[in-house]
């Protein structure tokens, strides 16, 4: 399993020969490691409707034929935008696609799609657990800290957790460290920080918070474009 951070909350997860692209905010992302034309996913997972997460998902799926996975409202929206292959689901559900198990889990945030200054339905924000033969990864999406994370850890046992640390709109370093304690992954990778001034954070602070809790978890700090492999 190879996990590449593309900046912000965007990741490429290569698992069991399947390329999974999550929250592809690439256009307009000053830290993006790739452009929309440089990705060729099999699946595109969208956690919620905000522009820095839905991002280029529709355009990428239309260009590549990738399947877009999203909560029901986002899947229907994508279909209306011309995406041919969608998998709609909802929190608590698991689907099997491309040989992988994909589970939608709760995220505490908001979700709207804005078009021409008008808000259209974006459904409920979610996270994902992606599981295959080579391992499992939990992408938390944008979220605050919640006890749901303990259940996510107990039920799905993700080996790698991708967690926002930017604060203001999501957890900060302290809350994200507590999330690590609840989830009990083997590896934690911080995300959703440093893209814009309101979410500037030092990822080393997150690492220190995890260490202060005495957790036997490896914190891997990536630069955009760097990968973690296991």
Swiss-Prot record:
Mind listing the GO molecular function terms for this protein?
hydrolase activity
Organism annotation: Methanopyrus kandleri (strain AV19 / DSM 6324 / JCM 9639 / NBRC 100938)
Q: Which HAMAP family match?
A: UPF0173
Protein name listed in UniProt? UPF0173 metal-dependent hydrolase MK1542
Transferase is among the record's keywords: no
Superkingdom as given in the UniProt entry? Archaea
Looking up SUPFAM superfamilies in the UniProt record yields:
Metallo-hydrolase/oxidoreductase (SSF56281)
Q: Which family does it belong to?
A: Belongs to the UPF0173 family.
Q: Which UniProt keywords apply?
A: Hydrolase
Which Gene3D superfamilies does this chain map to?
Ribonuclease Z/Hydroxyacylglutathione hydrolase-like
Q: Which NCBIfam families match?
A: PRK00685.1
User: Does Hydrolase appear among the keywords?
Assistant: yes
Task: Name the Pfam families on file.
Answer: Lactamase_B_3
